[in-house]
Regions:
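Short, small-residue-biased leader/transition segments that mark boundaries at the very start
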Residues: 2-10
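Family-specific signature for flavin-dependent thymidylate synthase
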Residues: 16-280
Length: 280
């Protein structure tokens, strides 16, 4: 979907937004097998006296599709919590991951800056900075300075801690390893929001619906919007009926909840996310 104003189209941004910088990657690692049939089975159980095996046997592809359409139309979303999707996300900034983890009904595993050295950290350059040579030069200079500062502090702390551990009777190998970990813990305080991170995310379908409503919106910050759009594309490939109407609130609910802050592009946004159903 396209961002407001002069920002580039999200469909192109997955390939181009990080051009000249660190590339974002979103991978669907795994998901519940037969996701649509699982949802349909769970939902049908609520209204049937049949045993579960019989319910599953009676769910043809057409019946599953029909049942899911009905669930979505009446807003019966609790059966969708039985299906989860796990994503591997790389090449995003810490600024982006901080927004991501605010979606609380989910599971996250993120690369630690406490236990992993950032001695050569990659960073994400916003497109608006990338497009202006003067801003880009200043941004890169600051990243270089922060990297140098991080390494200096890490080395100073490593030497300090190593000396203390040796005095406590540790072996040289153990003292050095423990000193490095302890140094990373505090040296990371100088790292910028631009610092690249990696994270594994698991969400159930109901949570994904809520996530897409907020983060696929034109008013979402550009980076997490790009992540959300790519996650949605992958979900649509894996479970097209479940996610057929997924997207920002104006797509899922039929109207924009932003009031005076609306982007005013409801028709255009609906068209873009409708076309996403046909993209593989």
């Amino acid at each position: 979907a396209c961002l407001v104003g002069s920002e580039m189209c999200i469909r192109d941004s997955i390939k181009n937004m990080w051009k000249g910088s660190y590339m974002m990657r979103v991978e669907l690692i795994t998901h519940t097998p037969e996701p649509e049939k699982v949802v349909a089975t769970a939902a049908k159980l609520c209204y049937s006296s049949s045993d579960i095996a019989s319910l599953r046997e009676g769910l043809t592809e057409e019946k599953t599709k029909s049942f899911i359409e009905r669930l979505v139309s009446i807003g019966h979303e609790s059966p969708m919590e039985h299906v989860s999707f796990t994503f591997g996300i790389e090449g995003i900034s810490r600024a982006c991951s901080h927004q991501l983890v605010r979606h609380r009904i989910a599971s996250y595993s993120q690369k630690s800056q406490r236990y992993v050295s950032e001695s050569g950290f990659e960073f994400i350059t916003p497109p608006s900075i990338e497009a202006v040579p003067e801003a880009k030069a200043e941004f890169d200079k600051q990243m270089d300075q922060l990297l140098e500062c991080y390494n200096k502090i890490a080395n100073i702390l490593t030497n300090t801690h190593e000396k203390a551990f040796l005095e406590q009777g540790m072996s040289e190998k153990d003292a050095l390893n423990k000193a490095k970990k302890k140094a990373y813990e505090d040296a990371r305080f100088v790292l910028p929001n631009a610092c690249e991170t990696k994270i594994v995310v698991t969400m159930n379908v109901r949570t994904l619906f809520n996530f897409f409503q907020h983060r696929c919106c034109n008013r979402a910050q550009w980076e997490i919007k790009a992540v959300a759009d790519e996650m949605l594309r992958l979900c649509k490939q894996a479970a097209p009926e479940l996610f057929k109407n997924a997207g920002p609130s104006c797509v899922m609910k039929g109207k924009c909840p932003e009031g005076a802050m609306s982007c005013g592009k409801l028709v255009e946004v609906k068209k873009i996310y409708g076309e996403m159903n046909n993209v593989e």
